[in-house]
């Protein structure tokens, strides 16, 4: 079957934002104006297409990334039909994993900002994730109708907080209640949307006289920005005039190189600015043909020598970026095709696990609705039914042309709770449910406390775990008792120590003999490229320890990293060197050297000024002025450090750094202090050394368990 849409007309985009910036409403308007939906879905009514989970509809927030497809030919039908594959991602920091894996497979992104709140903590997190994968972006400054809206303030924040180069291609006409339309700086026309038909129709008019000077000023910036894209455009700018198409061409070149961020504006809720923003997606975000899929941009693993070409006649390659459990069809594997094509019933190689898998059925997803299709090609995003052993980040490829795409990296959990089923008969059901949820969400971990036998679940925040426990009940009918949240501390050292470890058992018959000297020191370089930032160095010379025993020494140390020494928490940021030792020709074995290494490591660790590290969160509290003193006092009591304050309409944003352990229950306390008028956001910042008195308390508490 021939391709219906040329790949040059594909746009694989994500829509990302801080919570409450209006991202899902923006997506709903896109679906309405592109004809996918025939009525407007509203977040506050619980009727948003993309927020289909019960928890999303109840809470009015996005929890899981949702995929859909629409087609767009331009406001004035100036384009041939373009296929836009959209992934709507969560705005809450607890679900940042959904943004991470979406950014990995997207070609472009729309960053939505609230015209009042501007660039907020999760906006910065999402920006870093987009930078990591070098994703070209446009900005949509939403909620221009809200009290306190300030378009130019948000542009300055994009510049100052995100270190980006925002280039306005539109200006708002009015603001707050007087926001009525936009000025298109490329056409130099104003656009007004009809309020009678929900913004479906619009008209171009002349720019209001009182905005002409401002428009000309920003138009000149636009012309200069575009002219810098190439010598041809520079010459034309200097000696002739740039046409509308020249300006778009120059901005596109620079946008695809991530040199600029085209900025648009509007009000999704008031049905203004969405169609013109869609035109911006077509003009300035890349098609798959514009992206280089190679080792150089960290797309391919280092072992692969070629680049991937997004052509249908190339060998098949795809990345599985999400696993979801569907109550009707079982596991759904979401994947992005980079080259070639695949039909339902075909067999592919999961090169990450070296296993072949059969594509049972292929479906096109529209939020939680499935449309069965027979074939997908390069550039497509779809889901497969029937893949048995695929996990997030696995490469699927032609068995005759194996390839490995660079795997995704996921953040380590920062919070844990103990869970147990309300009835013993549900123990097996709970284990099965938790394992299925963990397969879906790589930032969610399930483990067992060896001493107490309790099941421990770990995640990115209180809300993250609360949602997963709720899902366990709704989707798997397992009720559970949940313990108090526990912080995921880390252990490390501050000094360098050399230590000997011996394990000798020689009491008749075959004995055991292992003898090592280890040097352990802080690993501050962060070059280890593993989650613990652990480096192992072998400096044995002269055969003091045979080569075959060196891996056992490394293994003995790594087991201690997982179990901890000081208080039972994972050990991070250590470099261990084995530099001497001895062996017995008959009695030495792998197990003996493994135990000897463990003995030496534990002893050295306790002598190397061990400390506990705690997760520190960046917390931003938005509060009316009259409660500012109470809020700051409470943050100080929580061991918070105030980094700064920003003025907002009738209030302040207080920016602080606070240990996660002090933030449990903060939402309730803040509501109480401010009569429900303040709000806060929080994201993980880094690990810091724990004060001595709290360290001693935690060690003593863990020893009593």
Curated annotation (Swiss-Prot):
Its main location: cytoplasm. It is found in: Cytoplasm. One of its GO terms (cellular component) is cytoplasm. PROSITE patterns: G_TR_1 (PS00301), G_TR_2 (PS51722). CDD domains: EF-G, EFG_III, EFG_mtEFG1_IV, EFG_mtEFG_C, EFG_mtEFG_II. GO terms for biological process: ribosome disassembly. Residues 8-289 form the tr-type G domain. One of its GO terms (molecular function) is guanosine tetraphosphate binding. Transmembrane segments: none annotated. Pfam families: EFG_C (PF00679), EFG_III (PF14492), EFG_IV (PF03764), GTP_EFTU (PF00009), GTP_EFTU_D2 (PF03144). Keywords: Cytoplasm, Elongation factor, GTP-binding, Nucleotide-binding, Protein biosynthesis. Signal peptide: none annotated. GTP binds at residues 17-24, 88-92, 142-145. InterPro entries: EFG_II, EFG_III, EFG_III/V, EFG_IV, EFG_V, EFG_V-like, EFTu-like_2, G_TR_CS. NCBIfam families: EF-G, PRK12740.1-5, small_GTP. Belongs to the TRAFAC class translation factor GTPase superfamily. Classic translation factor GTPase family. EF-G/EF-2 subfamily. Catalyzes the GTP-dependent ribosomal translocation step during translation elongation. During this step, the ribosome changes from the pre-translocational (PRE) to the post-translocational (POST) state as the newly formed A-site-bound peptidyl-tRNA and P-site-bound deacylated tRNA move to the P and E sites, respectively. Catalyzes the coordinated movement of the two tRNA molecules, the mRNA and conformational changes in the ribosome. This is Elongation factor G. The lineage of its organism: Bacteria, Pseudomonadati, Pseudomonadota, Gammaproteobacteria, Enterobacterales.
């Amino acid at each position: 079957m021939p391709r219906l849409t040329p790949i040059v007309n594909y746009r694989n985009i994500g829509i990302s934002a801080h919570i409450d910036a209006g991202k899902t409403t923006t997506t709903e308007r896109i679906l309405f104006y592109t004809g996918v939906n025939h009525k407007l879905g509203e977040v506050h009514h619980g009727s948003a297409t993309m927020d289909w989970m019960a928890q999303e509809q109840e809470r009015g927030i996005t929890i899981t990334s949702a995929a859909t497809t629409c087609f767009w030919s331009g406001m004035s039908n100036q384009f041939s039909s373009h296929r836009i594959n959209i992934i709507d991602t969560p705005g809450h920091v607890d679900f940042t994993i959904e943004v991470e894996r979406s950014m990995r497979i997207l070609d472009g992104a729309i960053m939505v900002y609230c015209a009042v709140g501007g660039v907020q903590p999760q906006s910065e997190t999402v920006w870093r994730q987009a930078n990591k994968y070098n994703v070209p972006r446009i900005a949509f400054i939403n909620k221009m109708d809200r009290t306190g809206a300030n378009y130019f303030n948000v542009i300055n924040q994009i510049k100052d907080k995100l270190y980006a180069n925002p280039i306005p291609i539109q200006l708002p006409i009015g603001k707050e209640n007087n926001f009525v339309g936009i000025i298109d700086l490329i056409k130099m026309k104003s656009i007004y949307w009809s309020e009678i038909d929900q913004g479906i129709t619009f008209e171009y008019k002349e720019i209001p006289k009182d905005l002409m000077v401002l428009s000309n000023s920003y138009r000149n910036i636009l012309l200069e920005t575009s002219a810098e894209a190439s010598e041809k455009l520079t010459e034309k700018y200097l000696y002739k005039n740039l046409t509308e198409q020249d300006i778009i061409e120059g901005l596109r070149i620079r946008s695809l190189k991530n040199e600029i961020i085209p900025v648009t504006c509007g009000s999704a809720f008031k049905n203004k600015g969405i169609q013109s923003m869609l035109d911006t997606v077509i003009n300035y975000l890349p098609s798959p043909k514009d992206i280089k899929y190679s080792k150089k941009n960290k797309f391919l693993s280092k072992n692969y020598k070629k680049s991937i070409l997004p052509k249908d006649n190339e060998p098949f390659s795809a990345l599985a970026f999400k696993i979801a459990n569907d109550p009707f069809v079982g596991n759904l594997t979401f994947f992005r095709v980079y080259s070639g094509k695949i039909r339902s019933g075909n067999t592919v190689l999961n090169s990450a696990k070296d296993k072949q898998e059969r594509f049972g059925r292929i479906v096109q997803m529209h939020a939680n609705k499935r449309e069965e299709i027979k074939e997908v090609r390069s550039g497509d995003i779809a889901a497969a039914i029937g893949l048995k052993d695929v996990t997030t980040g696995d490469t699927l490829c032609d068995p005759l042309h194996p390839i490995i795409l660079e795997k995704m990296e996921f953040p380590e959990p920062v919070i844990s709770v103990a869970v147990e089923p309300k009835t013993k008969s549900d123990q097996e059901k709970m284990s099965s449910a938790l394992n299925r949820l963990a397969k879906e969400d790589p930032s969610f971990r399930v483990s067992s406390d060896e001493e107490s036998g309790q099941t421990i679940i770990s995640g990115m925040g209180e809300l993250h775990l609360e949602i997963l426990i709720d899902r366990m009940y709704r989707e798997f009918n397992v009720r559970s008792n949940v313990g108090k949240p526990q912080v995921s501390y880390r252990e490390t050292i501050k000094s360098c120590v050399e230590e000997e470890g011996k394990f000798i058992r020689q009491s008749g018959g075959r004995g055991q003999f292992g003898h090592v000297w280890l040097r352990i020191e802080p690993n501050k370089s962060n070059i280890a490229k593993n989650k613990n930032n652990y480096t192992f160095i072998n400096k044995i010379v002269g055969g003091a320890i045979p080569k075959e025993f060196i891996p056992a020494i490394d293994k003995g140390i790594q087991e201690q990293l997982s179990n901890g020494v000081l208080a039972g928490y994972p050990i991070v940021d250590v470099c261990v060197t084995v530099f001497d030792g001895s062996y017995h020709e008959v009695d030495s074995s792998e197990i003996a050297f493994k135990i000897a290494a463990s003995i030496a490591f534990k002893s050295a660790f306790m002598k190397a000024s061990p400390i506990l590290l705690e997760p520190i969160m960046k917390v931003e509290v938005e509060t009316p002025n009259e409660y500012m003193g109470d809020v700051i006092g409470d943050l100080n009591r929580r061991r918070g450090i105030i980094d700064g304050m920003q003025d907002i309409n009738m209030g302040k944003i207080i920016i602080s750094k606070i240990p996660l352990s002090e933030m449990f229950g903060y939402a309730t306390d803040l509501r109480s202090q401010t009569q429900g008028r303040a709000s806060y956001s929080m994201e993980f910042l880094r690990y810091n050394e724990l004060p001595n008195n709290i360290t001693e308390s935690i060690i003593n508490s863990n020893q009593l368990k």
